[in-house]
C-alpha cells in the first residue's frame, strides 16, 4: 500500500461529496454492454450517457439542469444499428459529440442548443472505415474537426470530420485489440494500451512508434494509458498476481518505470482521469464504489496518494467534467458523474478555503473552447498548444460556453446545408468527388434535351393523326 507521508500539498484535504437525490438523473437504463469504456461524457452544457436500447444502439443527452426522474419516453440519439461502445464531446463545440459502435461505424452528431426535443437518428456525418466494432473515439485537443477512432480490427483511423475523409490509417502498429488511446497536450503524439500488454507512444502523422514498452503490466486484464502535461505516460493495469497497479513512465527512457504502485486485488478496470492544471490523477474502477486520487510531482516517489472518496453503490461508468464547467466560487476542483444501474449521480470535489476570493493557485488558466489549428493545418504538420482562458469570472451553468468562434465550424455549415436540401442529413466518408458529379449532371441534361425533342416530335405526330381522324368523321 501507499506510505502516508505528511507532505505539503494544497490537495491533501480535497473533500468529495455526492449531490442530493433531487440533483441526480434518475430512472436511466445504463448500458449493460461488456466493454470497458466510461459510458458517460460530460461538458459544461450536457451530460451524455450510453443506455440500453432495443434494436440498435443509443445514448441519451441531457442538459445539466435536467435533473430528477427522466421519463421513459425521453428522446435519445439512436442512429447506430449496434450497441454504442464509446462517446466523446468535441472540446471546441459543446453541441458536437462523436460515437463509436458495434456496427463498425463512427457517427458525429450536432445536439440542438437546448437539448433534444425528439429522438435523433440522422447524424451530421457517418465515418465508415473499420471492419469490426469501434471501441474508442477521441477528439484532437487542439485541431478543429480532427477525430480519432480505434476498432477491434486493430486499426486506428484519424478523420477530418469537416470533409468526412479518413486522412491517416495506422494498420500495422497493433497486433491485437486497442484498449485505450490518449492524445498528448498539443496533439502531436498519441499513447496506446494494447491487449498484447504493450504501451506505445506513436507519432500519427509520421506513422512511427516513438517508444514502446512490453509487459508494462503483466496481468491479462485490460490496461489504460494517458499522457500527462509534461510528456510522461501514466498507466493502470494488473500485475501477474492480479493486483491492480498504477505506473508512471518517461517515453525518453521507457525501459524502467519512474514509479509503480500496487493497489488491491479487485478485478475492475481502473479508468484514469487527469487534470493537467493541478497534476492530479483520479482513478475510478468499474465495479468499485470509490474514487482514489493522486498528485504527480517531480519529487520521489513521484506519484503521491492523496485520498479516497467512497460511496455505498458500485459504479458502472464515470463522466468527468472539463475544468471550465466547474463552480470556482465553491472551490470545486473536479466533478464526476457516476453511473449506477438506474441513475447518474454527480460527485463534487472541493478544496475547503476560508476566503471567498478567487483562488488563483487552484485555478491557473485552463484550456478553453477555441481551437488554435484547423484540421488541414494539423494534417500538414503544424502543432498548436491549447488556447488558455481564465476562470476568474466563472461560468453560469446552462449558458452557451462557446466563448469565441474564430471561424464558423464546418459542422454547422454541413448541418445547415443538409436541412435545406431534400437529401439525407448524413454523408458517408465514401462521398462522390465533384468531378463525377459534374459529369453526371451533364449526362442528365443531355437526357432531358433528348426527351424534350421526343415529346415535341410526338406532339406533331399526334396533331397530324387528330387532323386525319377529323377528316374521316366528316
Swiss-Prot record:
Record-level GO cellular component terms: cell cortex; cytoskeleton; endosome membrane; lamellipodium; ruffle membrane
WD repeat intervals: 79-119, 129-169, 173-212, 216-259, 264-304
Keywords: Actin-binding, Cell membrane, Cell projection, Coiled coil, Cytoplasm, Cytoskeleton, Endosome, Membrane, Repeat, WD repeat
Region (Disordered): 415-437
Polar residues biased stretches: 418-435
Cysteine pairings via disulfide bonds: none
Matching Pfam families: DUF1899, WD40, WD40_4
Record has Ribosomal protein as a keyword: no
Subcellular location: Cell membrane; Cell projection, Lamellipodium; Cell projection, Ruffle membrane; Cytoplasm, Cytoskeleton
Membrane topology annotation: Peripheral membrane protein
Oligomer status and interactors: Homotrimer. Binds F-actin. Interacts with RCC2. Interacts preferentially with nucleotide-free and GDP-bound RAC1. Interacts with VIM (via head domain).
Homology family: Belongs to the WD repeat coronin family.
PANTHER family, per database record: CORONIN, CORONIN-1C
Protein name stated in the entry: Coronin-1C-A
Organism expressing this protein natively: Danio rerio
Gene: coro1ca
Amino acid at each position: 500500500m501507499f506510505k502516508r507521508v505528511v507532505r505539503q500539498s494544497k490537495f491533501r484535504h480535497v473533500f468529495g461529496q455526492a449531490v442530493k437525490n433531487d440533483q441526480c438523473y434518475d430512472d436511466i437504463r445504463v448500458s449493460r454492454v461488456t466493454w470497458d469504456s466510461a459510458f458517460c461524457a460530460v461538458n459544461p452544457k450536457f451530460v451524455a450517457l450510453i443506455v440500453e436500447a432495443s434494436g440498435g444502439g443509443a445514448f441519451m443527452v441531457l442538459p445539466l439542469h435536467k435533473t430528477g426522474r427522466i421519463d421513459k419516453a425521453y428522446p435519445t440519439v439512436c442512429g447506430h444499428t449496434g450497441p454504442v461502445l464509446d462517446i466523446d464531446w468535441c472540446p471546441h463545440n459543446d453541441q458536437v459529440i462523436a460515437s463509436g459502435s458495434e456496427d463498425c461505424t463512427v457517427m458525429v452528431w450536432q445536439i440542438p442548443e437546448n437539448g433534444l426535443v425528439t429522438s435523433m437518428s440522422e447524424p451530421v456525418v457517418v465515418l465508415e472505415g473499420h471492419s469490426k466494432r469501434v471501441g474508442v473515439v477521441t477528439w484532437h485537443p487542439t485541431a478543429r474537426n480532427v477525430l480519432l477512432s480505434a476498432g477491434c480490427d486493430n486499426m486506428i483511423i484519424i478523420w477530418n470530420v469537416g470533409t468526412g475523409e479518413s486522412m491517416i490509417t495506422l494498420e500495422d502498429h497493433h497486433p491485437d485489440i486497442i484498449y485505450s488511446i490518449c492524445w498528448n497536450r498539443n496533439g502531436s503524439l498519441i499513447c496506446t494500451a494494447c491487449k498484447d500488454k504493450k504501451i506505445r507512444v506513436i507519432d500519427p502523422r509520421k506513422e512511427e512508434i516513438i517508444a514502446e514498452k512490453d509487459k508494462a503490466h503483466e496481468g491479462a486484464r485490460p490496461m489504460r494509458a494517458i499522457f500527462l502535461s509534461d510528456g510522461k505516460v501514466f498507466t493502470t493495469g494488473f500485475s501477474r498476481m492480479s493486483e491492480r497497479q498504477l505506473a508512471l513512465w518517461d517515453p525518453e527512457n521507457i525501459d524502467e518505470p519512474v514509479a509503480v504502485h500496487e493497489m488491491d486485488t479487485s478485478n475492475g478496470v481502473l479508468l484514469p482521469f487527469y487534470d493537467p492544471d493541478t497534476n492530479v490523477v483520479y482513478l475510478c474502477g468499474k465495479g468499485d464504489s470509490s474514487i482514489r486520487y493522486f498528485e504527480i510531482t517531480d519529487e520521489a516517489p513521484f506519484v503521491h496518494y492523496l485520498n479516497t472518496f467512497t460511496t455505498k453503490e458500485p459504479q458502472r461508468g464515470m463522466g468527468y467534467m472539463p475544468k471550465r464547467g466547474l463552480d470556482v466560487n465553491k472551490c470545486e476542483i473536479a466533478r464526476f458523474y457516476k453511473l449506477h444501474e438506474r441513475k447518474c449521480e454527480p460527485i463534487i470535489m472541493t478544496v475547503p478555503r476560508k476566503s471567498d476570493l478567487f483562488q488563483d493557485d487552484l485555478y491557473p488558466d485552463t484550456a478553453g473552447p477555441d481551437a488554435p489549428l484547423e484540421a488541414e493545418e494539423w494534417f500538414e504538420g503544424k502543432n498548436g498548444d491549447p488556447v488558455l482562458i481564465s476562470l476568474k469570472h466563472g461560468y453560469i451553468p446552462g449558458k452557451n460556453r462557446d466563448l469565441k468562434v474564430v471561424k464558423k465550424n464546418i459542422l454547422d455549415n454541413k448541418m445547415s446545408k443538409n436541412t435545406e436540401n431534400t437529401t439525407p442529413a448524413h454523408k458517408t466518408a465514401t462521398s462522390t468527388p465533384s468531378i463525377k458529379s459534374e459529369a453526371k449532371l451533364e449526362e442528365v441534361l443531355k437526357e432531358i434535351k433528348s426527351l424534350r425533342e421526343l415529346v415535341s416530335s410526338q406532339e406533331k405526330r399526334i396533331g397530324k393523326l387528330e387532323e386525319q381522324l377529323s377528316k374521316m368523321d366528316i
